[in-house]
Amino acid sequence: MEKLNEGLDPSTPFHFAQDDTLMLDYLIPFLTRTFAFDANSPLLFTQFYFWGFFAVVFAFLTLIKNRIALRNAFLFATSLFFYYKTSGSYVCILIFCVIANFFIGKWIERAELQWKKKFLMIIVVIIDLLVLCYYKYSYFFLDALYDFTGIELHVYNFFAAASNKMFGTHSLVDTIILPVGISFFTFQAMSYCIDIYRGKIKAVDNILDFGFYLSFFPQLVAGPIVRADKFVPQLYKHFFLPRRTFGIAVFWILNGLAKKIILSDYLATNFVDRVFDTPLLFTGLENLIALFAYSLQVYADFSGYTDIAIGVALLMGFRLPQNFNSPYKALSPTEFWRRWHISLSSWWRDYLYIPLGGNRNATLGTYFWMGFLSLVAIMLSGSVWVGIALGLFFLYIAIYAYLKPDSRKFITTNMNAMSTQIVGGWWHGASWNFIIWGGLNGFGQVFNKIWVKRSRNFRAAASFILFASSAIIFKQTHIAIFAITAAYFGILFTGIYSVLIFRLFSDKYIHGIYVAWNVSLTFIFITFTRLFFRAGSNLDPAEANEVAWNTAKNMVQQMGTAWKWDTIGTIAWEHINIILVFVAGMLIHWIPKKIKSRYRIAFASQPIPLMVASSAFIIFVIYQFMSADSCPFIYFQF
């Protein structure tokens, strides 16, 4: 130190100490902020902090890229840190799921007797479902108990109580908060153990490798749900990032950010949220615009998250499955669900719909689920009359199937499809709105199967009758829902008659007209079902049922009755920015797949300097649309 101070002011030695102190003054708060959980600032793809976090992860990953065991352990630890920054102490639940599913999965594989394998598989599925149901459906079951017996019990958060005692936290014990992404990683864990039981995959040998599979941070909190047979083999491959793959990854990230910020967040903060919060303050047209805008918002939000997740994973050398395939190009509700949230839809197909009998027959599981869902409906309604109505409906179905044996396969197939859709609705939340949303999607699929088998003349006549009867009922009762159904069936029969008339003159463009028409009808139907989906979202579980139902009812009322025809032009002009963003988003969505593939490859094939410049420009444009408070991704709540 003396040599260092030669020729310097006598105060110099203290200068070094002061610098060290100042450095610590900055470093300690920085580390505290970095490693502390802040519920108001979760780690999101839309935050600059996330990209700083990912830059560190990516840099370290390139240093250990060929040391597979270390890489997997590092990414597992990184994923746990990511989840901790998103959900705090709930990371312990994720760790519990990793431990439980890893060891029981190993036991399933080692069991020699089939009944032991099945018993262990059932045990692990029950464990995963109990974890999910405790956090997601506690309010629902306690409310149902009170409605039917008058016994009033309150939720108690055992995990929060244990956390307070062990770690000195101050979490509320009388409130249960849904951990982010719990529905996704529990489903992923269940599919892993079920696939081991079915002999489809081998159990993972190393718990760190399995933990990495179950918690991989890009897709942890909102999917896509990754199957072990597709992802686990990637755990043991060396890291390799070709130049074009790097370009494709950057493209997906920028594409996802543009969807989320320019489309989804802009529509939500500037119009959609305001209308859904207070629908009675807006006209029927404004409610309708908000509903259609929400259809684009939820797609841009969810597929935007998936695009970013795919891009981030690709930069680290891992491929995630496609989760969306231009769903608003679907020609029917059934096709829509093949294109929307593909990883969840295929999960329902493989682990619920097909085991129930699929399109072959009914099984004991079919009747169990129909009975269980009927019980759920009775609990939600709090009325025995709902149970009587459902009982009479199932009695009618049973008598019809008995009298017409040829129809049994059709009935059971559609019962399985309906059960799957309603369970899917209930997976999103325990309120009437999600049950109705799932039921409407199931009804749409069943109705479409019946409808397309009928002749054009029959469809023309039936659509006119449905339109006329809905219009007459609305005229007599002023019940808003009949105005909406009259409008839908009016559009339907207008289209059918237009096609019939057009065929009299030319068949040249009939296929294109048919495709455009069915895409439009499907989009309108799916958009209407979203009314019940959005109304039930982002609510306190303790009051979700009442608030969601009132929101949906008020919006239906406004859309069915609150129209001022002389002000339509003025109202539309007031919201021209929203309409233009919606139209632009839909036009981009409807661009043919081949063209999208070409400009994706063109971006990835650019020289690096040009790619950097174009990426910087895109980021600058995206930044102009960012609001002060970024909206959380919609599917975080599930």
Model-derived segments and their meaning:
Residues 22-637:
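Membrane-embedded transmembrane alpha-helical bundles that form the catalytic cores
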Residues 10-12:
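Short, low-complexity intrinsically disordered segments enriched in A/P/G/S/L with frequent Arg
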Residues 1-8, 18, 373-378:
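A cross-taxon signal for low-complexity, glycine/charged-rich
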